[in-house]
Amino acid sequence: TALNDLQIANQQLKTDMEKEQALEQQRVEFFSAASHELKTPLTILKGHLSGMLNGISGYENNTEYMERSLAVVDRMENLVKELLYVSKTEGTQKSAYKVVDFAEVFRVQLATVSDLSEEKKQHLEVNIPDRLYCEVEQVQMERAIQNILVNAIRYSPSNESIHITLSEIHGTIRGEIENTGVHVPDDALPHLFEAFYRADASRNRNTGGTGLGLY
């Protein structure tokens, strides 16, 4: 009936409005968090420069504080790059899905992080088939794999092993990256895909994470 159609239309409109409100709230929270993340390194950088320019006690070693300032700038640059990437992927650009050799994608990303694991004398135990085809958005998938690999290496102690397995079970591809270091607490798991979320903010600041790797 016309009444039922009107009720259905009203319910759909209400649902759409609630979704839009939720998205807007996410945007507000995202930019608020982004502002905070940029403000902290800027404050540190300003303190270093002010101390050196004004000859404040403790800042006599300019080389040391210039190196620290450069590290802060590097962190800010990485964060800005991540923000630009997120802005791009949340825009009007459509994802380009295509069939790729997923095993080869994994191997390429492993090669990009090999220097990092060698520095810590870690052993990567890799079990990946010769070929494994699937349809993915390659750029975003490469980024996600690299972020997980880098985190596994960063948060594992030196001289430890990291197990990497890729397999296909009943038509579903399963990738596993298991390290022997710091584990994510159970209560943090639901938040892993939130912007800027870090299970331990102080620990992640020391290792250079932005909290956008899985967003």
What are the roles of these predicted feature ranges?
Residues 2-26:
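Conserved signal-transmission helix
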Residues 18-52:
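Primarily the dimerization/phosphotransfer
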Residues 68-76:
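Short alpha-helical segment of the dimerization/phosphotransfer core of two-component systems
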Residues 91-96, 133-136:
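Conserved micro-motifs of the catalytic ATP-binding
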Residues 98-99, 118, 123-133:
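Conserved catalytic submotifs in the C-terminal HATPase_c
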Residues 152-153:
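Short helix-loop "hinge" at the ATP-lid/N-box region of the Bergerat-fold HATPase_c
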Residues 159-171:
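Short beta-strand/loop element within the Bergerat-fold HATPase_c
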Residues 184-196:
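Short conserved segment of the HATPase_c
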